[in-house]
Design a protein with these regions (language model features):
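N-terminal interaction modules that seed assembly of large macromolecular complexes
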Residues: 68-107
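Short N-terminal edge-element motif at the start of the domain
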Residues: 36-73
Length: 373
């Protein structure tokens, strides 16, 4: 099971638990620390402030592009980010796309389907922007100092607390910007550019603006749909309408099964999706494991006893992957009771002796669920 796909999809859908009460301090010496309070005399840079600065920086790139002869038949704009927290702006025009594919040594062998796929492949876009000028350039560099420190420390809890003088502090960032926050930033900046900057561009009738996560399965199943209305989405990607219909038919068919069999059905879909086999449901319909989690969670409270029974069984068998999937279903579900939390605590007792990973999984999940009650 791909927990990263699940986490990123959940973030893009706005189902994200932000770290709102901690801050990262970046000193003039580029050292990075954690703190629970903003050092005196400083203001923390949060999501809104960072998004505004990034939007303004990309606006300048768009304005510069708009003044060139290339500003015609612009059909796509995308704000890209990934686990490395880089932010890139991509633009493409029909002419730029034509130059890209005709310049390829494989041009003569491209099918129409391949050409269409390349049309929205960011790596084949003719115009991209990854550098910044002015005050945001130093803020962005310090932001990446924090990213590197978090990676080296294994997360916020691995950073040392800041005990130095406020005079040594260069920037203070809210922790919500990191650990997945970059994906929400990319989406919000895309929406801002769509509202504030696209008027500068000479766009095509089917112009599309979208964020990108670096995973086509996440992008097509979740991300693009946040900024492209359904009618336009199907017009640009007609194959996705067939994928959506096929997946929805599978959802409706599964709903007719007994609850225990529904749990088994979606778990088997996740297992089949491990290696992206072309005939696997999630792969064939351009979905991720998140949609399997969501399909079960959407059934609601009636399916929870079957989920808990399957969880106890997977814990007893030491099947960490299946247990993790079922925990994700619980995290996606609403209306959980304290009784379910009690059952999770009891389920840990079924774990094989010495299997601390499953015990830790259940503890982390239970803590997250408890925080929602």
């Amino acid at each position: 099971m791909n927990r990263q796909d699940i986490a990123v999809s959940r973030i893009f859908k706005g189902k994200w638990e932000r770290d709102e009460h901690r801050f990262l301090v970046v000193t003039h010496a580029r050292d990075v620390y954690m703190t629970n309070a903003v050092p005196k005399g400083h203001q923390a840079i949060g999501r809104q402030g960072f998004e505004t600065a990034l939007t303004d920086a990309f606006y300048e790139h768009i304005r510069s592009f708009a003044r060139t002869a290339h500003n015609r038949n612009v059909y796509a704009l995308s704000v890209y980010t990934d686990e490395r927290h880089s932010f890139l702006l991509y633009l493409n025009t029909l002419e730029g796309f034509e130059r890209t594919i005709t310049g390829s040594p494989y041009y003569c062998s491209y099918s129409e389907e391949q050409k269409h796929d390349l049309k929205y492949s960011l790596g084949d876009f003719a115009f991209s922007y990854a550098t910044f000028q002015g005050p945001f350039a130093s803020q962005y560099a310090a932001y990446h100092d924090a990213v590197k420190a978090l990676s080296a420390a294994g997360g916020p809890d691995g950073l040392e607390p800041y005990k130095g003088s406020p005079d040594l502090v260069r920037y203070v960032y809210k922790a919500e910007l990191f650990e997945g926050g970059q994906f929400l930033t990319a989406l919000h900046v895309t929406k801002r550019l769509l509202a504030q900057s696209v008027w500068l561009l000479q766009t095509t009738p089917d112009f599309a603006a979208f964020a990108s996560s670096g995973s086509e399965y996440i992008d097509y199943s979740v991300v693009m749909r946040q900024t492209i209305d359904t009618e336009r989405f199907y017009r640009i990607f007609p194959e996705m309408k067939s994928c959506d219909e096929a997946f929805q038919a599978a959802v409706e068919e599964a709903r007719g099964l007994p609850y225990g069999e529904q749990v088994t059905y979606w778990w088997e879909c996740v297992r089949e999706n491990r290696n992206r086999q072309p005939d696997a449901l999630l792969t064939a319909t351009v979905r991720t494991d998140y949609q399997a989690v969501e399909a079960l969670a959407d059934v609601g409270a009636p399916i929870l006893p079957a989920v808990m029974q399957a969880l106890r069984s997977s814990v007893q068998q030491g099947d960490q992957e299946k247990a993790a999937f079922l925990c994700e279903v619980l995290l996606e579900s609403g209306g959980l009771s304290r009784e379910v939390l009690g059952e999770m605590a009891a389920a840990a007792e079924y774990a094989p002796p010495g299997d601390q990973e499953i015990r830790s999984l259940l503890t982390r999940t239970r803590q997250k669920l408890t925080g929602r009650l």
